[in-house]
A protein has these predicted regions:
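Short, surface-exposed patches at the edges or C-terminal ends of soluble domains, predominantly
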Residues: 2-338
């Protein structure tokens, strides 16, 4: 379960601030969920909940049939699924830590023990890149507080800061049951309910900071025929002033990724850096409307009093849930060293 010679894991202690080092970013991850709310969802509910670990094991069988994943060693409820997300970011944390010389610190809005941590100076003081991972289900009502918005706004006045917002998918946002079923048959993930809506907190940040984006759908990315390899991204490298796409051709596979729909034509306000081709094998309202790729990476340069950058990328790009290719690792390194 743990890698040999890995540092001892610590739990249930206060964060020790990292010292500023010129040219080396201090990266923080902020999971927007209430861990208890998500884990206490009724497992008989059809929509807007995570799978239990038992459900994951059944669907993915026999991938998780080793000793590491049994009842004696791993949580079998929804909590096990959330812990898999935590574990899946460790490769990114390791790579970014090596690249920057600073450990990547992970925070949760409400953690396993019920401690609530809104975004404030305790998080922001020693953070240069804040990665907001929007994996809160909408019914959990994790809205950003006015004082959080004010704290982030003040932080973004600091030179060299970057707010990375990662809203996840919005599947089945209609009352039309036939459309929900069409979406399901498109992404083909039996662990995703017919309605699964995420990222109220991230949406609140996007509204507060005038980010002209809406996270929509859960789209299956296209692969190269006869392989499991993703089709290359469509990139706009002339707009990539931060070098985020240097040596990057693909991100990673995830069966239901959000489309970051733009609500403005102002190219000076926000730049679309990369699009991902969509799997066209099964119909979807998005492709039926004439679209064959979705927006995957966007950037807002500093503007007015905001000295920091804003980047939008799905949170699952920073996990190894479906593997971590050489191209993806290069993207992680670019994010760490931007």
């Amino acid at each position: 379960m743990s890698k040999p010679n890995r540092a001892a894991r610590a739990y249930n202690q206060d964060h020790v601030p990292r010292k500023y080092t010129p040219g080396r970013r201090r990266i923080s991850i902020y999971w927007t969920w209430s861990y208890p709310w998500e884990c206490n969802c009724d497992v008989a509910a059809m929509d807007n909940r995570f799978s239990t670990w038992t459900e994951v094991r059944r669907v993915a069988w026999p991938a998780f049939e080793g000793r590491d994943w049994d009842q004696a060693n791993f949580l079998q409820g929804i909590d096990g699924t959330l812990e898999l997300f935590h574990r899946s970011t460790i490769p990114f944390q390791d790579l970014a830590g090596e690249a920057t010389g600073h450990p990547v610190v992970v925070f949760q809005r409400v953690d396993q023990a019920g401690y609530r941590l809104p975004i404030d100076e305790r998080i922001l003081a020693d953070t240069d890149t804040l990665m907001v991972f929007g994996l809160d289900h909408l019914p959990s009502a994790q809205d950003a507080l006015p004082e959080e918005i004010a704290a982030i706004r003040e932080w973004l006045k600091r030179e060299g800061t970057c707010l990375l917002i990662g809203p996840h998918h919005d599947v089945g946002f209609t009352d039309d049951l036939k459309q929900r079923q069409m979406e399901y048959l498109h992404h083909r993930d039996p662990l995703v309910p017919r309605q699964q809506r995420f990222s109220l907190y991230a949406r609140a940040l996007m509204k507060a900071f005038d980010v002209p984006v809406v996270n929509k759908w859960g789209l299956r990315p296209a692969v190269i025929k006869g392989t499991k390899d993703l089709q290359p991204l469509t990139t706009f490298r002339d707009l990539d002033k931060l070098g985020l796409l240097k040596d990057v051709t693909t991100f990673n596979f995830h069966p239901h990724l959000p489309h970051y729909e733009l609500t403005t034509d102002d190219a000076k306000k926000i730049s679309l850096l990369a699009c991902q081709p969509v799997d066209l094998e099964a119909p979807h309202p998005f492709t039926q409307a004439g679209n064959n790729e979705f927006n995957a990476l966007l950037w807002m340069p500093p503007r007015a009093q905001r000295a920091g950058d804003i980047v939008l990328a799905d949170l699952t790009i920073f996990t190894e849930l479906f593997g971590a290719s050489e191209s993806l690792c290069k993207f992680w390194r670019n994010i760490a060293k931007m």
